[in-house]
Amino acid sequence: MSEQLLTASMPIDAAPLSDHAVATAAPATSKINLLDLNRQQMREFFAEMGEKPFRADQVMKWMYHYCYDDFEQMTDINKGLRAKLQRVAEIRAPEVAEEQRSTDGTIKWAIKVGDQQVETVYIPEGDRATLCVSSQVGCALECKFCSTAQQGFNRNLRVSEIIGQVWRAAKIIGAVKATGIRPITNVVMMGMGEPLLNLNNVVPAMDIMMDDFGFGLSKRRVTLSTSGVVPALDKLGDMIDVALAISLHAPTDDIRDEIVPINRKYNIETFLAAVRRYLAKSNANGGRVTVEYVMLDHINDSTEQAHQLAECLKDTPCKINLIPWNPFPGAPYGRSSNSRVDRFSKVLMEYGFTTIVRKTRGDDIDAACGQLAGEVIDRTKRTLKKKMAGEPIAIKTV
């Protein structure tokens, strides 16, 4: 697969919801939003219009390589087809409600999705630029150290609202690229929400990210992060191959039960077994998973707990990211001191684990890990909590 940088360039001359999800916001018009369709679905849509499949590929190239949303600008499409598309389809990405820029180059966009907002973050680092994308309006998992979880949960994002975050960011960056802002090289599903609780919209969106007629990223440059929805993780491995990161954050079940409540349903042993099953199917991970571990002062950061973590992960090929905790109002935790983080890291490295202390980015604009909040109307949190407590979570394929 060829790979391109995600930025708008100037040319030379609808998925079903998972059973557990509440209703996704309805389209504003009766037209088909082409951002909701991956390439297979686009070709089927064009076939229904009596058009050849390659016409769908042409339109996708204009949509994603150049970030065009006006059919009239697609000059290699005949006028008759352009007129037909104007009648039955549209390219409608979510709009930016607010932009904030950090002193370190990080950019946070508040993205309008219906009557609410999610947040998307652009993070430049060396020769890379990573876009952190949201998958849900809010989150139902209630991780105690995460600002998003404190907002409650409203709904899943549609495909167009997920890939639309990438489209909008690429268009903005393309418009200002002369100022030296780097094109997007990586996308991480680490924004608001649990991606595995929205598989039927997240998977087609990631498919578009990696499609040659989409954004053309390699599968190693698209990462999904999960807190441990085990049935959906098993399903993911049968649907798509992307890099995997796991939000572990504790070496033992007693601590993880408290700070990552889904652990009460799928404990660490069960979660890591599912991770190993995914790695056995995947070519995107280089044989190992990224373990994310937020450092909470005197909660999960002792030397003893570092030894416990090493023992916990001994059978799971991985690299470990230690993440300084980023505070938010009302949170019951403190950030681990540099000395405690250093000691923790050294223990892990003595066991042979590749261990990185993640640099905090965008904390001056509340864009750092765990700080994303957006604007969420919590309508369904209690229902989802009840399901997670006792009922199996049903997952449908696309």
Curated annotation (Swiss-Prot):
Lineage top rank: taxon: Bacteria
Localization in the cell: Cytoplasm
Cofactor comment text: Binds 1 [4Fe-4S] cluster. The cluster is coordinated with 3 cysteines and an exchangeable S-adenosyl-L-methionine.
Start and end residues of each Radical SAM core domain: 125-364
Cofactor(s) this protein requires: [4Fe-4S] cluster
Binding site for S-adenosyl-L-methionine: G193, E194, S225, S247, L248, H249, N326
EC number: 2.1.1.192
Family assignment from sequence similarity: Belongs to the radical SAM superfamily. RlmN family.
HAMAP family membership: RNA_methyltr_RlmN (MF_01849)
Matches recorded under PANTHER family: 23S RRNA METHYLTRANSFERASE (PTHR30544), RADICAL SAM CORE DOMAIN-CONTAINING PROTEIN (PTHR30544:SF5)
Record's function text: Specifically methylates position 2 of adenine 2503 in 23S rRNA and position 2 of adenine 37 in tRNAs. m2A2503 modification seems to play a crucial role in the proofreading step occurring at the peptidyl transferase center and thus would serve to optimize ribosomal fidelity.
Name this protein carries in UniProt: Dual-specificity RNA methyltransferase RlmN
Gene that encodes the chain: rlmN
